[in-house]
Each structure stands twice: as structure tokens, then as C-alpha cells.
């Protein structure tokens, strides 16, 4: 198997696990907190449909904001993308629950609970990304490069050093 295929498999597995954990967190919150706040709680298939809807919402927002790019973008950019995706998802959660429920006892309390749940998800994602990038670095160490310079020295080494997690210039030679 090529390196790119292995990277894709690792990143895909990492993303599926993260998506499932975020969905399970929502399912727990839905079944034990949000659903109990409704005047007429959902039953059986309604609960499953709500969890599936949020699963799709998380997937779409992560895809839209680039939250699935572990190993392709820097950690700061990855966390920022995932934060935007989770905030967008939280707004969507609130709107979906408010619109499907018709009437909730306390809309302010619901918004506060969703905000706290989103903060928990954000902390989880940061920790999960840190662990994921550490494992990624062990499985796929930086590619060792030989830099060959011509008559005019360029700034390529500086650009490559910005991604020390992906590339490592081992030696630099010059021909004239």
C-alpha cells in the first residue's frame, strides 16, 4: 500500500470515531436532557431520527468547514475548523429542537445546555486532535528531503520548516 492510501485510511478511521463520539454525546444529551424538556417528548423512532439528523448535521458542517483534515492542515487550523463546525452544529441543534418540538418549557435553558454541551465537545475535539496528531506523527514520520540549490539560493527551506510535522530537510547541497 502506498503512503497516501495508508494516510487516508488512518484519517478516515480517526474521523469516523470522532463523528461517532460526538453523535453519542448528542444522543445521551437528547435522551436524558433535551427530550425531557419538551411538552410532548419524542418516542422510539422519533429519538432515532433526531440523533440521525444531528449526525448528518455534524458530518455536513465538519465537511463544510474542513474539520476532517487531520494531517493535512496544522493543528491550530484544524481546531479552528472544528470549532466553527461545532458552533454551526449547535445553532442547528437549537433550531431543529425548537422547530420540531413546537414548544419547549424553557428556551433559554435549552440554549444554555446546548452551549455547555458544545463547550464539552470543543474540549473533547482539542484533546482528540492532540492525541490524533501525536499518533499520526508516530505512524507517518516526516518525509526526509534533500534540498538542491542552484546559483540563486531560495527560501524553500524556510517554507518547508513551517511544516516540520510533514517534511524534514536532512541535507542541503549547492551546485554552481
Language-model features: where?
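Signature of alpha-helical transmembrane segments in polytopic membrane proteins
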Residues: 1-139
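A solvent-exposed beta-alpha-beta segment
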Residues: 134-176
